Amino acid sequence: MSLSNKLPVTDVDLKGKRVLIRVDFNVPLDENENVTNPQRIVGALPTIKYAIDNGRKAVVLMSHLGRPDGKVNPKYSLKPVVPVLEELLGKSVTFTEDCIGPQTEETVNKASDGQVILLENLRFHAEEEGSSKDAEGKKVKADKADVDRSASLTALGDVYVNDAFGTAQRAHSSMVGVDLPQKAAGFLVKKELEYFAKALESPARPFLAILGGAKVSDKIPVIDNLLPKVNSLIIIGGMALTFKKTLENVKIGNSLFDEAGSKILGEIVEKAKKHNVEIVLPVDYVTADKFSADATVGSATTQRIPDGYMGSDVGPESVKLYQKTIAEAKTILWNGPPGVFELKPSPRPTEATLDAAVKAAESGSIVIIGGGDTATVAAKYKAEDKISHVSTGGGASLELLEGKELPGVAALSSK
């Protein structure tokens, strides 16, 4: 699956057409059903506004919210999104009580002059995810006839646009089942694909990957996919301690040791040697007796973390090593924070490593943060606008790094 050859919405003639856009409005709501963080709605605005300005018939928005398990549940209605969307767009938004059916089709077909229509939660129907849950919480497959009703979504548009990268790894009806001649990438998806293509298909070199996480075994598919592509690999987070204990016989105190992951480190090292990849590991640590804001903290060299303590972050010498490696790279792909950045005693190493990535971006390097916890770090230290790209899709970006095909991307038309 090529990431760089997907049809962008800017290459599609939208004039006089019903533009059906899969957005990600899975936003948090408070107890009064008010949207508490509109970031995902804001992220979709460029595509929505483009469709309004260039289509002039109807802009039909569809999304999921929460996990209603294939049944109608007012708690997960998208209706609270309407006032937020209206304020952001500066125009009225029509809400439909269902996402499919004759009444919804009539509303869409009567629309004109760039009218914006928001459909009710896609996941109120079992056919969206292909299953629902019964009263006992057991999964029940959707009826074949119901799954085929993805044609009902197709009836709502003339052109399909996907701008929900965070759901691109899921082969759901709204992601892969809409059968229209042109299926384009919205601006948000287009940006995601462009940046991941820069790293995974045609990176400027040296190409550095920074990978973190608690367990090596969780990142084996990512490491395996990236080793033939990168020039250097910084291992951070808890899994670095499994590397240190296994490869260098370092005492790691009470730190988590990934027994299963340790058994394949030999293969990883051999593969790195085969592809001439430098693996960079920490050389000192910040330690803590517990993962809590009132933890007793200390420091440790590369040789030994004392019993009763865990490695909670890297030390100053490790940061210097990371900074040097980051400064030398022209493409940097980062997934996973260096340490337990939530702890008050040890934010600085994480922040210092992020600062190095920001400086690299400012000097012209491509720096991509792969969603999830790493994106949270970027937001915490207000670095989102200083990095080349912070991915909006934790699960989707992880699957791209693993070399997997994303169903929602594969379903898009080629240029």
Swiss-Prot record:
Q: Where does CDP bind?
A: 213, 218, 237, 336, 341
Record GO terms (molecular function): ADP binding; ATP binding; metal ion binding; phosphoglycerate kinase activity
Q: Which domain of life is it from?
A: Eukaryota
Q: What class of enzyme is it?
A: transferase
Instruction: List its EC numbers.
Output: 2.7.2.3
Give the pathway listed in the UniProt entry for this protein. Carbohydrate degradation; glycolysis; pyruvate from D-glyceraldehyde 3-phosphate: step 2/5
Q: How does it assemble?
A: Monomer.
- The name on file for this protein is Phosphoglycerate kinase
Species name for this entry? Penicillium chrysogenum (Penicillium notatum)
The protein's gene is named PGKA
